[in-house]
Swiss-Prot record:
This is Phosphomethylpyrimidine synthase. Residues 1-13 have a biased composition (Polar residues). The keyword Iron applies. Zn(2+) binds at residues 419, 483. Residues 1-30 are annotated as: Disordered. Belongs to the ThiC family. It comes from Nitrobacter winogradskyi (strain ATCC 25391 / DSM 10237 / CIP 104748 / NCIMB 11846 / Nb-255). [4Fe-4S] cluster binds at residues 563, 566, 571. It comes from the Bacteria. Binds 1 [4Fe-4S] cluster per subunit. The cluster is coordinated with 3 cysteines and an exchangeable S-adenosyl-L-methionine. The gene is thiC. The keyword Cytoplasm does not apply. Homodimer. It holds the Pfam family ThiC-associated.
Length: 646
């Protein structure tokens, strides 16, 4: 690209280094041993008596001690060789960056341009370019092999355990396999049930897959506004979000330096990056929706395709005939993109140019393998408006557009609400599957109540867990700042952790083969009072340690058999352990303690039933209780002495 240089220097500071008691590891797929698929291994204590636990890792090179991070140079461009190896692409100069791409920002507010520049690639001819086209042609790409290995969490086949987990879950028609193979990935993509968002110009990408038959994914939104944030803050928020588990990131910048901010993010992002191109297009016409044109919008698409954006939210379902359906709503049109297009349609009294030019948009996006995220511009902004005519009219149109995009060779996912009470959530999922041919569903929450500003990460996390269980493939996080302001670094982490909980809960309910391994490992650590393992197996070790240390800060408390909730005498798990320890000392009477309902059935010579094990055990323990003083809690030395006598 030809980029005008800027004399300023931007040096974003980002968080690096491993999470507590974790190390980066890589798995090599059998089908492509040259690939290095990242995992995070949680290191358990020596006393655990079980192997370390591998978990899915979205953090990229930022947690790899063998990689020197240079944000100014960007991440390694590993995928470039994969794309060129397949052929069917050409390198070209690309469009010149224009002042309006960054909002005509003045020199005093201009951010430094990213220094490393790469000529963009684009597809040529009729040869396969997109992952969908390769899948339909029966070709398994390196991206498909990569995500198959990633979904299996580096494990080889463990079919007995996997099949038991699947049998225990309720997947509502999803077909989660016991083991993910590259061929299964190819079939799901060819069918349109899954996508691998992977622009051929995002060479820094570590591929991931979105689909209802795979792990539920989460997205984190970042981006500046006209009143706050900077390039440095947004790059830092991106790295921070993926550290805690964001599978994709959307840059929703609406202020100055939009192009430059996006370039810095893309060159340093190992996860797919999504955008809403209409936001930047609006900035190019001074924020007036009436001035928008197809030509200006198309130019913005080209700009972002060349940079490497992996998926676009395009509100092509907001049609002129549907706008009046929102007139009686409590909250009208709450989508920014939806309201922009609604105003344009009414001002010109024309059908949306996104709808009328949709096939041209497909042809353009196909050249770069940019995936569609068909936007829900008429989503409900309050539970009073959930599942109304406007929402479902748009959804039906998105189903029609999905078929067009598929015919053009483009990957597609569908965006969903919004604000939906719990009893109406499954209706949304079922209708989306029906109308959109099982294309992956990607929802914002949904929020299940409107009464909790400041806590909408919780109101939406409830709905997110439910719709993820019902079949939603990716959940867009909501932070505590939703409806109140632009999220900061802490809000981003809170939103990501909340949605990791929701996604994992959905995976558990669906019976995903590997989901419960982490739960069980943490439960064993909890019962064994392995505090450090408890902290490290959790989604947020830092917060877990901080909460524990508020009341029990000493190192000795990290090995204590109690916490500050119950104390040493009332810990249920400690009492249970004591019971087990006692049962082990009973010798022949162990069965009486563990299985009190089993008893001899024979009568004695006089016809009187023999005492049951339970009766015998109860009498013995009653006598022993009295002998030892009749106290609920006893001196440990007395108990030991009594056990020796037994």
């Amino acid at each position: 690209m030809n980029i005008r240089s800027n004399p300023d220097t931007t040096r974003p500071a980002v968080t690096t280094g491993a999470l507590p008691s974790s190390r980066k590891m890589f798995s090599a797929p059998d089908a492509a041993p040259d690939l290095r698929v990242p995992l995070r291994e949680i290191l358990l204590s020596e006393g655990a008596g079980e192997p370390n636990l591998p978990v899915y890792d979205t953090s990229g090179p930022y947690t790899d001690p063998n990689v020197i991070i240079d944000v100014n140079a960007g991440l390694p461009r590993t995928r470039l060789a994969w794309v060129k190896e397949r052929g069917g692409v050409e390198e070209y100069d690309g469009r010149e960056i224009k002042p309006e791409d960054n909002g005509n920002v003045g020199a005093s507010h201009a951010a430094a341009a990213f220094k490393a520049h790469h000529k963009p690639l684009r597809g040529i001819g009729d040869a396969p370019i997109t992952q969908l086209e390769f899948a339909r042609a029966g070709i398994i790409t390196k991206e498909m092999i990569y995500v198959a290995e990633r979904e299996n969490l580096g494990r080889k086949k463990q079919l007995e355990r996997a099949e038991a987990a699947l049998a225990d879950g309720e997947a509502f028609g999803a077909s989660v396999p016991a083991f993910i193979t590259p061929e299964f990935v190819r079939e799901e993509i060819a069918r349109g049930r899954a996508i691998i968002p992977s622009n051929i110009n995002h060479a820094e990408l570590e591929p991931m897959i979105i689909g209802r038959n795979f792990l539920v994914k989460i997205n984190a939104n970042i981006g500046n506004s006209a009143v706050t944030s900077s390039v440095e803050e947004e790059v830092d928020k991106m790295v921070w979000a993926i550290r805690w588990g964001a599978d994709t990131v959307m840059d929703l910048s609406t202020g100055r330096n939009i192009h430059t901010t996006r370039e810095w993010i893309l060159r340093n992002s190992p996860v797919p990056i999504g955008t809403v191109p209409i936001y930047q297009a609006l900035e190019k016409c001074d924020g007036d929706p009436v001035k928008l044109t197809w030509e200006l919008y198309r130019d913005t698409l080209v700009e972002q395709c060349e940079q490497g954006v992996d998926y676009f939210t395009i509100h092509a379902g907001v049609r002129l005939p549907y706008i009046h359906l929102t007139a009686d709503r409590v909250t009208g049109i709450v989508s920014r993109g939806g309201s922009i297009m609604a105003k344009w349609c009414l001002a010109h009294h024309k059908e949306s140019f996104l709808y009328t030019h949709f096939e041209e948009i497909c042809d353009l996006m196909r050249k770069y393998d940019v995936s569609f995220s068909l936007g829900d511009g008429l989503r409900p902004g309050s539970i009073a408006d959930a599942n109304d005519r406007a929402q479902f009219a748009e959804l039906e149109t998105l189903g029609e557009l999905t078929q067009i995009a598929w015919k053009k060779g483009c990957q597609v996912m569908i965006e969903g609400p919004g604000h939906v009470p719990m009893h109406k959530i499954k209706i949304n999922m079922d209708k989306q599957l029906k109308e959109c041919g099982e294309a992956p569903f990607y929802t914002l929450g949904p929020l299940t109540t409107d009464i909790a500003p400041g806590y909408d990460h919780i109101t939406s996390g409830i709905g997110a867990a439910m719709i993820g269980w019902f079949g939603c493939a990716m959940l867009c996080y909501v932070t505590p700042k939703e409806h109140l302001g632009l999220p900061n670094r802490d809000d981003v982490k809170t939103g990501v952790i909340t949605y990791k909980i929701a996604a994992h809960a959905a995976d558990l309910a669906k019976g995903h083969p590997a989901a419960q391994l982490r739960d069980d490992a943490l439960s064993r650590a909890r019962f064994d009072f392995r505090w450090q393992d408890q902290f490290n197996l959790g989604l947020d070790p830092d917060t877990a340690v901080a909460f524990h240390d508020e009341t029990l800060p000493k190192d000795a408390h990290k090995v204590a058999h109690f916490c500050s909730m119950c104390g040493p005498k009332f810990c249920s798990m400690k009492i249970t352990q004591d019971v087990r320890d006692y049962a082990a000392t009973l010798g022949d009477n162990e069965k009486a303690a563990l299985y009190p309902d089993t008893a001899p059935k024979a009568n004695d010579a006089a016809g009187v039933p023999e005492p049951s094990y339970r009766d015998q055990g109860m009498k013995e323990m009653s006598a022993r209780f009295k002998e030892m003083g009749g106290n609920v809690y006893l001196d440990a030395e007395k108990v030991k002495e009594s056990n020796r006598v037994l």
